[in-house]
Amino acid sequence: MDSSRFGCSWLRDLGFTEENWSLRKGSMEDLLAVSYVEKECFPPLEAATEDSFRERLKFYGNHFLLLYKGDQLISFVDGFCTKEENLTDLMYEDASLHDEEGSWQMIFGVNTVPAYQRRGIASKMLEEFIRMAKEEGREGLVLTCKKEKI
């Protein structure tokens, strides 16, 4: 997938001048990287499992936005689409509930490896994810977040 389509220019605005950044949608090839970043960002009892990400990538890999620096995953946003406008616990657990025709884009995770946190990456990733949802004609997005993660 052509990363220029996603507008990586914001990386320069954040002070990242290296040329080896890429922004793209997810695939099963990203499973280990996504699972690793999740474990870096959340305590063991809160982190989604590798099996959970396997199912998510299978059902809605095109709703993962991944930022790589070379071959290292730095940040990702993921979530599925649904006709429901409220995010429920079941949605986190059952990737098959994804409905590509759904008018609502849920956001299940916003993850950035600790070495790159507090540098504006997550905010820009969310902006790009929102832009993509609008481009796809979604009515809105839903994100829940623990206060200490904001």
Put a short name on every predicted segment.
Residues 20-34:
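A short beta-loop-alpha structural element at the N-terminal edge
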Residues 21, 72-76, 105:
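Glycine-rich phosphate/pyrophosphate-binding loop shared by adenosine-nucleotide-utilizing enzymes
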Residues 112, 118-131:
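Conserved acetyl-CoA-binding loop-helix of GNAT-fold acetyltransferases
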Residues 126, 133-146:
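Conserved GNAT acetyl-CoA-binding A-motif
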Residues 36-49:
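Helix-loop element at the rim of GNAT/NAT acetyltransferase active sites that forms part
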Residues 77-110, 117:
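Conserved acyl-donor/pantetheine-binding loop and adjacent beta-alpha core of acyl/acetyltransferases
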Residues 1-15, 84, 130:
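Acyl-donor-binding surface of acyltransferase catalytic domains
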Residues 63-77, 81:
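Conserved beta-hairpin
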